[in-house]
Amino acid sequence: MRVGIFGGTFDPIHVGHMIVAEQVMDELGMERVVFVPSGIPPHKEASSVRAPAEDRYEMVLAAIAGNERFSADRIEIDAGRPMHTVETVPLLKERLPGEEWFFITGADEVSNLLSWKDPDRLLEEVVMVAATRPGYDLSRLGHLEARLKNFDRIFPVECTRVDVSATGIRRRILQGKSIRYLVPEGVREIILSRGLYRADARRTRGELLKEERS
């Protein structure tokens, strides 16, 4: 069985994430994709994560509802500390069924793979799927070939381009603009009902790292 792991902050999860997951799953014949929201991301400043981990996890659950081939795992949230992907993957492989494992992320993130912890060891555990937009210049990944012995475990998959980003969604919320159709409807309802990403919510929901570390 082929299983994809889709990690990220999902702050918030949006239609771009859903399209990538569906198209990669279809292209590579995966049985399922497991979404793994980060708890305390090791590569981001604490202040850059806007919504608490529990809210982000519940938004992921809302986004994947109705797709039986999508699931979510809170392994990184429950860890209560920053977890690197190379730590997360072996633990997931122990607790979930699967024979072939893939890690799904954007090509721009893959181009920075040398900054990840133990990238070659990670590539021994999974095939790294670099989701690209149409027309993406694959030579932007070429610098990795001489530095990674497992470079051949990086596999680009072209996905439909949707000009949606979590940053742009948060900006629209701050500006009082609609985010309908940019995120799944269940995600939009959580954001609105909890007042996430509004200017007055930044600190009220958000001594988040202090809360999540305690």
Curated annotation (Swiss-Prot):
It is an enzyme of class 2 (transferase). InterPro entries: Cyt_trans-like, NadD/NMNAT, Rossmann-like_a/b/a_fold. Pathway: Cofactor biosynthesis; NAD(+) biosynthesis; deamido-NAD(+) from nicotinate D-ribonucleotide: step 1/1. GO terms for molecular function: ATP binding; nicotinate-nucleotide adenylyltransferase activity. It catalyses: nicotinate beta-D-ribonucleotide + ATP + H(+) = deamido-NAD(+) + diphosphate. Keywords: ATP-binding, NAD, Nucleotide-binding, Nucleotidyltransferase, Pyridine nucleotide biosynthesis, Transferase. GO terms for biological process: NAD biosynthetic process. SUPFAM superfamilies: Nucleotidylyl transferase. CDD domains: NMNAT. Its EC number is 2.7.7.18. HAMAP family: NaMN_adenylyltr. Catalyzes the reversible adenylation of nicotinate mononucleotide (NaMN) to nicotinic acid adenine dinucleotide (NaAD). Belongs to the NadD family. This is Probable nicotinate-nucleotide adenylyltransferase. It comes from Rubrobacter xylanophilus (strain DSM 9941 / JCM 11954 / NBRC 16129 / PRD-1). The gene is nadD.
